[in-house]
Amino acid sequence: MESGLSQAFQEELTCPICRSCLTDPVTISCGHSFCRACLHLSWEDSPAHCPMCREPSQQKDFKTSIVLKKLASIVRQASLMKYLISEENKCVIHKETKGIFCMENSIYLCRLCSDSHEHRGHKHCPTEAAAEGQMERLLKQMESLWEKIQENEENLEAEIVMISLWETCLIEREEAIRAKYRASYPDLTEQEEEHIECLRKEGNYYLEKLRKSKATIVETSKQLREMYQELMVMSQEPYVILLQDFDDIFRRSESIQLSKPLAMIPELGGLAVHGLI
């Protein structure tokens, strides 16, 4: 009976998308709950429907379910405690349970080892608190990264629109030049072609810059998403794994976010046809 209740409890705290214990859980309008990151990625390229019942959702910005988050934390803490009291986690020197975490070296210590000369000057905390702190650090990093992904998408959309407008502008300007020559200078066909060539050269110069700018934004978008997915996988790990040294991942995430390719806005005045239009 107790085993069945425990299994049912864990099932309720399992994300239907990733099938891991809920991380930063959110509950949508139909009542189903998911990891925030799983829902972000699920809705990114498709209409906002519940992945379970397919009910449409008008809302996309959800607050974390505090109750579910606390319950999920209890499940993770229970798994961590099971490891902490295991024979595998006993100090080989003092035969004590290693219930203290050294923040400096990212290792588990027993009470006596934490007070040794080697570790006395390091920052220590209970392993459970260290795990919770690492999870919060991870969730903040993911939130920041997701905001950067959305910002980058807006820049990409703006660049696509600008390329289309620029191509249209080139066509319209060329038509205007030809119309002006036909109306006012019908005999100057050579000058007309030179004028058109000048226009195309200048216009294509900016068009190429726009396309390169778009390619840079697309590449940044790919890197941001790959980093987000890497952090998401990390967030689904048990606390025992989460307490390993992940500083390199955080450094890479922060470095990627420093890259800020902006949509290019060329000077439309660069296509003015002096002395003619």
Name the predicted role of every residue range.
Residues 1-277:
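RING-family zinc-binding modules in ubiquitin-system proteins
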